[in-house]
Regions:
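Class I S-adenosylmethionine-dependent transferase superfamily signal
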Residues: 58, 131, 155
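Class I SAM-dependent transferase core
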Residues: 1-39
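Conserved SAM/SAH cofactor-binding pocket of Class I
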Residues: 27-113
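Core SAM-dependent methyltransferase catalytic element
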Residues: 168-195
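Short beta->alpha hinge that forms the Motif I/post-I loop of the SAM-binding pocket
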Residues: 71-74, 123, 146-147
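Conserved helix-to-beta-strand junction in the class I
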Residues: 87, 133-135, 158
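A short glycine-rich, Lys/Arg-flanked "PGG" loop and its adjoining helix->strand segment in the class I
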Residues: 125-137
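Conserved beta-strand signature within the Rossmann-like core of class I S-adenosyl-L-methionine
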Residues: 138-145
Length: 195
């Protein structure tokens, strides 16, 4: 059991040794939360929720029934459900899914993610590309990582731009869905002279 006060909300959280950051709320998650404001009507997705910190904060600051939490780990999903119930946000929805593969909800105002650090970027690529499609036009993807260049380039290629903030050694990326198509698909092909 850990305790944390986030955005003025005191939380008691059950964790487990096999999950990410079981002894304290991760510094990257804290950095990301420092850049986000939740509104009462926001439809929010905590993508890769772990034991549910981000989704729980969103549910307590907004309306719990407008918050979804998603993770591929059954233990994380179970703990997220328990933590939501124990902290007065049991109306939120927790889903077991490998990324968006078994999750089809759309129209999110905010998708927040602290993706796993891997060498091949397959997971964050999936989260960015499929996350774009799950946002409402005007919705925002917020991600936090320790690496900047790949994420900046990938998010820009999908969203057409990204705001990057450095917070306590982490990079927080905020990108807004402005249209219905990826930025790269909106670019017109260049004509080649002499070919």
């Amino acid at each position: 059991m850990i305790t944390a006060t986030l955005k003025g909300i005191e939380l008691r959280l059950e964790t487990a040794p096999g999950l990410f950051s079981p002894r304290a709320v991760d510094a990257g998650t804290l950095a990301m939360l420092s850049r986000v404001e939740f509104g009462q009507e926001d439809k929010v997705l905590d993508l890769g929720c772990g034991y549910g910190v981000v989704g729980l904060v969103a549910a307590r600051l907004g309306r719990a029934e407008r918050v979804w939490l998603l993770d591929q780990d059954p233990a994380a999903v179970e703990l997220a459900r328990a933590n939501l119930a124990a902290n007065g946000a049991g109306a939120s929805t927790v889903v077991l899914s490998d990324g968006f593969r078994s999750f089809f909800e759309t129209g999110f105002d905010k998708i927040l993610c602290n993706p796993p650090y891997q060498a091949d970027f397959a997971v964050p690529k999936h989260f960015i590309e499929k996350g774009f499609n799950r946002l409402a036009v005007g919705g925002t993807l917020t991600m936090v990582t320790k690496r900047e260049l790949w994420y900046r380039n990938k998010i820009t290629s999908v969203f057409g731009g990204v705001k990057v903030s450095e917070v306590d050694g982490y990079f927080v990326f905020e990108a807004t869905r402005k249209t219905t198509q990826y930025a790269a698909k909106r670019l017109k092909p260049r004509s080649r002279v002499g070919s």
